Amino acid sequence: FVLLKAINVTKKFGELKAVDDLSFVVRAGKIFGIAGPNGAGKSTVYNLITGFYRFEGKIKFEGRDISGLPPYRIAKAGIARTFQIPQTFPSLSVQKGISVGSRFGAAGGLDPAHVDEVIRFVDLEKERTQNTGLLNLLGKKKLMIGAALATRPKILMLDEPMAGCNASEIKNLMKLISRINQDLGITIIIIEHFMKVLTELTETLLIIESGRKILQDEPAKVVSDPRVIECYLGNANADRE
């Protein structure tokens, strides 16, 4: 069934249309990818879904219009996100950093048992008492994903989770994302520049350019579509070989 639906969504900053009459659907239990050139409006779409900006059009979650709701209400409804640059709490331990997420979730309060489960799930058990500021890049990414999972989301939105990662770290994060989807049954939306990551992880891929939808289809069809190659994949064909 359709879990999230964007209907004719438009966002202007002055005269610039960052998102231009964009419509798409995300089905429950799936991994949905969003890609496009730099400045295509991908992160703006995330900011609209999670209540950071007002906009024209509608966004529906579980059939309910969430347009215009503040971010904390959207988090409580079951939508969690991460950011391109890991947002950590340098003065807190890993355990406390993940606990912060549980306070903002649907349950509306700290759940130590759930926090423990999340720490184990994202494989930060050994770092539990460590200061978050001392984590390496992979650890910080896992912490941010863990804090989002602690909210008990129905949708987890990942914004370029592989940014800055080496091949081994990318493999590690891809495994974690697959487990979140398959083992926890959480629907995932992922923005990513690495097309190989998107073709391996996602079941549906949306390509946008200048805030407009170019194509939404299964990854194999998307990467071979001439419109997509022209707008986005011109320099990335080598990555697919």
Label each PLM-derived region with a short phrase.
Residues 1-240:
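Glycine-rich phosphate-binding loops of nucleotide-dependent enzymes
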